[in-house]
Amino acid sequence: MMKGSPSVPPAGCLLPLLLLLFTGVSGEVSWFSVKGPAEPITVLLGTEATLPCQLSPEQSAARMHIRWYRAQPTPAVLVFHNGQEQGEVQMPEYRGRTQMVRQAIDMGSVALQIQQVQASDDGLYHCQFTDGFTSQEVSMELRVIGLGSAPLVHMTGPENDGIRVLCSSSGWFPKPKVQWRDTSGNMLLSSSELQTQDREGLFQVEVSLLVTDRAIGNVICSIQNPMYDQEKSKAILLPEPFFPKTCPWKVALVCSVLILLVLLGGISLGIWKEHQVKRREIKKWSKEHEEMLLLKKGTKSVLKIRDDLQADLDRRKALYKEDWKKALLYPDWRKELFQEAPVRINYEMPDQDKTDSRTEENRGEETVSSSQVDHNLITLSQEGFMLGRYYWEVDVKDTEEWTLGVYELCTQDASLTDPLRKFRVLEKNGDGYRALDFCSQNINSEEPLQLKTRPLKIAIFLDQEDNDLSFYNMTDETHIFSFAQVPFLGSPYPYFTRNSMGLSATAQP
């Protein structure tokens, strides 16, 4: 220190002097701390969140300056000063959604209440009390959970010898976890996953799965919030007819080509070894130089043949793969595996009196089971379908009401004059379509259907080996409906009328 300079107290002594000066002016100094919840506060999206904070020790905070803020003190989430809330310094996104709970403010207990919680409200909050020169605060975390919509699962079509399945959902926060699994709980690897955020910060997910194992049957799409135990899931059935079936002649062709390639490879290897021997002999005997040239030409010829065969094989593979993909989209490919049913269709509506007065000669010509319903317009030239695969087509272009499919006897009880019949049919009534499975008065299943194109001709495929009955719209060659994995108890018969069944939950067929 220089001589003559006034003595200056050390900086460490200034704070106690200021406190003593303030004590002398005000007469008292406020000492306190602020406490808040130790664990994060978790609320659902769109509900109400309450963030409490408490002075310790307990004392009145009515005359204090209280501020809740996020990253920066200004602008604030909410400011309480001079006994009222100060809206002019509030963040715009919180206006009209916040209020201070102050019933216990005289004991130093207040809370910030946020209504209609949004995804942007998620994060850290600070509760600050200021009394004169004393200011203390506490931090707390608000976790917002958004449970999105139920998954939408559908098949997008065949791809690479399998079926691609797509699962989508929206309204999640934070980013959800998406999994595929089979009915046994085994996890399946997703082919692709896309997650995007909308303007409100909510996540939309879209994942796809390529199923090549036809034994799986069902797959389940499960979506779960990482901070919430509850999950939302949706299962989808993968029908066997949608999987591509391997043609024996194609397998034989591929095997033959592979064997040919192996043989060519063996021939090429033998030629290469012989070529090496010739090269050693040429070094010893120069007179055999011409023979070496001929051998090289032969080798090039064989290699060219092999390359040509490989190119032709690749071209055929590409053509077969393209044809197979196209075949899956049309019912015609199924006709290659099914035999045409020996049926006869009478497109004129039979008269009741004429039906009752049919001669025995006509009955002998039809050779139809006596249990066939009276108004059936389609007859089979045998006693029911034998075990196998059959298809037939029905023209329905001039009919506003019709029912077609198959039926079988439910019972062979001799005491019943009219044996019970089980129907699996497709029905049209006006503009409405539905698939029905019923026996007598009992409707086993009813499925309303939406068809983009009105069918003028319908093809029915009966597969007794795989227990499958499928209907195709031959107008646009699209699949309508399938009764899958439902066993046939007896010999089925074809069925077609120009009327709807008129069935409800209590009606009798």
UniProtKB/Swiss-Prot annotation:
UniProt-listed InterPro entries: B30.2/SPRY, B30.2/SPRY_sf, BTN3A2-like_Ig-C, Butyrophylin_SPRY, ConA-like_dom_sf, Ig-like_dom, Ig-like_dom_sf, Ig-like_fold
Biased composition (Basic and acidic residues): 351-366
SUPFAM superfamilies referenced in this protein's UniProt entry, alphabetically: Concanavalin A-like lectins/glucanases (SSF49899), Immunoglobulin (SSF48726)
Record has Isomerase as a keyword: no
Disulfide bonds: C53-C127, C167-C221
Ranges of the Extracellular topological domain: 28-250
Location relative to the cell: Membrane
Key words, A-Z: Disulfide bond, Immunoglobulin domain, Membrane, Repeat, Signal, Transmembrane, Transmembrane helix
Residue stretches making up the B30.2/SPRY domain: 316-509
Coiled-coil region: none
Annotated family: Belongs to the immunoglobulin superfamily. BTN/MOG family.
UniProt-recorded name of the protein: Butyrophilin-like protein 1
Lineage summary: Eukaryota, Metazoa, Chordata, Craniata, Vertebrata
